[in-house]
Design a protein with these regions (language model features):
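Domain-level detector for secreted/extracellular nuclease and nuclease-toxin modules, and
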Residues: 5-9, 13-287
């Protein structure tokens, strides 16, 4: 028996924990690159369970599960606390993940290049935000590795997704919180693909889970009273459409100056819905 994160209704922002026997296979890790997962402090719990084969990139800055079939992450997990936010600024150095590329080259594959989104009108959408790693230049640069990106519409990336990112940092900087965050794609509808080979799969939605702790707390202190946020945001155009084949709308300039900064709240959902749509199971005992 082990604790599994589960909730049937977290619109209130609270996660609940129940005991559950594992019913699906453990993560199918093809390759671990980097730190042992037990030493990665960005992971609040054990690796999420998934039926997808994954390559784990375990770094000081985050832990990333990469899917070589979609050529995108299955999820990325990171910790956000006050020491992660500094004055290094945004490097803007989108680049090939050379660690991932070296491994993929062994089977005649390659990692996504910084230019592979060119001409698609999709943003290179950070999962770990640049602004969550501004303590040093090198830490910020790791957020610009293309393995950390998903094809996101400009409206999703620069408006509703960004507003939740800003809210998260406000929790840390203004309320003294520590966050454990997991974000990734949902592929419940065929949305096409981009890239020179048309093999970078476009997600229909993006999910994010945020566990909100006090600065002096550790993952071991997470219980039924621990507040959290779960959202599922559609890969949506500014006009509200999810028809991403509409290149005219997809390529339109987007601004968030007049947008409601709390617009992300309309996308709150339940942990169980995130699990259902993403195919991931979140287990609270750490490896």
């Amino acid at each position: 028996m082990s604790k599994r994160l589960f909730s049937s209704g977290i619109f209130t922002g609270l996660f609940t924990l129940t005991l559950s026997v594992h019913t699906i296979a453990f993560a199918k890790v093809e390759k671990l690159i980097g730190l042992p997962t037990s030493q990665n402090t960005n992971l609040a719990f054990k690796l999420p369970e998934t039926e997808k084969t994954e390559i784990i990139l375990s770094r000081e800055q985050y832990l990333l599960s990469y899917n070589k079939e979609t050529r995108t992450p299955n999820y990325v997990a990171w910790k956000l606390e006050s020491t992660n936010i500094g004055s290094s600024g945004r490097s803007n150095n989108f680049s090939l993940d050379t660690d991932l590329d070296a491994y993929l080259n062994e089977s005649n594959r390659h990692a996504v290049d910084a230019n592979d989104y060119r001409g698609s009108c999709f943003d290179r959408g950070h999962q770990v935000p640049s602004a969550d790693r501004t303590d040093t230049v090198s830490n910020n640069e790791t957020t610009f590795l293309m393995s950390n990106m998903l094809p996101q519409t400009a409206y999703l990336n620069r408006v509703i997704w960004e507003h939740l990112e800003q809210y998260s940092r406000d929790l840390v900087q203004k309320q003294g919180k520590k966050l454990f965050i997991i974000a990734g794609p949902i592929y419940d509808k065929a949305m096409g693909a981009i890239g020179p080979e048309r093999d970078i799969q476009i997600p229909s939605k993006n999910f994010k889970l945020i566990y909100i702790l006090n600065a002096n707390q550790t993952p071991a202190s997470i219980d039924v009273k621990t507040p959290g946020i779960a959202v599922i945001m559609p890969n949506i155009l500014q006009n509200g459409s999810t028809d991403l084949s509409d290149k005219k709308e997809l390529c339109k300039p987007v601004t968030n100056e007049a947008a409601d900064r709390r617009d992300w709240e309309k996308y709150k959902t339940t942990l169980s819905e995130v699990e259902r749509l993403s195919g991931l199971k979140f287990v609270s005992s750490k490896i």
